[in-house]
Regions:
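Extreme N-terminal starter segment of soluble prokaryotic enzymes
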Residues: 1-4
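Class I SAM-dependent methyltransferase "Motif I" SAM/SAH-binding loop
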Residues: 7-12
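A short, Lys/Arg-enriched amphipathic alpha-helix followed by its capping loop at the start of a domain
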Residues: 17-25, 43
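The conserved SAM/SAH-binding core of class I Rossmann-like methyltransferase domains
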Residues: 30
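Conserved SAM/SAH-binding beta-strand->alpha-helix loop
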Residues: 33-34
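Conserved SAM-binding loop
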Residues: 40
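Conserved SAM-binding strand-loop segment of SAM-dependent methyltransferases
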Residues: 46-53
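Class I S-adenosyl-L-methionine
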Residues: 57-65, 75-187
């Protein structure tokens, strides 16, 4: 069983996908929003959510895990927002670097990041370049793809998101395959 630390955990949607495989168990979650945290704890009764702002979480407080997952806030990169990126006046753009702080300290075998599909093209590709450079600096090998929720899990929702999967070991990356789509049978 692979252990998971979940950041920007929300209500646990990404965790659910991992746990439903039967191979992963979320052992730590960090979520600042109290309502989302409460729902997460109802969905995962064995996990007490760390509700501190990620800036205030010492890396020593996060257990060493095999996997780190994080759907870092997307408002700074979304075409629906002001697209201020890392310069977002509310500080949401730089939260990716807090996630990288956790990856650097924890050194998980695998990290998965989720965000809006516009992340790749934001600021003429500079934002995504910075993200890739951070992963390179930490010695991770990665792949990414834009997936639409309605093609995975029989969900009648047109929701395109980018997923970045990073592996500490390049052999693990070479063994990785993106999931096959599932025909939509519900509308």
């Amino acid at each position: 069983m692979f252990s998971v630390a979940s950041f920007f955990a929300g209500v646990g949607g990404i965790d659910l996908g991992f746990e439903e495989t039967g191979e992963f168990k979320t052992v730590y979650a960090n979520e600042f929003d109290s309502y989302a945290s409460e729902t997460f704890e109802m969905n995962y009764p064995t996990v007490k959510v760390d509700q501190r702002d990620i800036h205030l979480v010492p890396v020593e407080d996060v257990p060493k895990t095999d996997v780190i997952i994080g759907g870092f806030p997307c408002q700074a990169f979304s075409i629906a927002g002001y697209r201020q990126g890392f310069e977002d006046k509310k500080g949401r753009g730089e939260l990716f670097f807090e996630l990288m702080r956790m990856v650097e300290a924890n050194k998980p075998r695998v990290a998965l990041f989720e965000n809006v599909k516009n992340l790749v093209g934001h600021d003429n590709g500079n934002t995504f370049r910075v993200i890739c450079e951070q992963l390179d600096l930490l010695g991770y090998h990665y792949t990414y793809q834009v997936l639409n929720a309605m093609n995975y899990g029989n969900m009648a929702q047109n929701r395109e998101r980018i997923y970045i999967v990073a592996f500490k070991d390049e052999e693990d990356l070479n063994k990785f395959h993106w999931p096959l789509s599932i025909p939509l049978t519900t509308t």
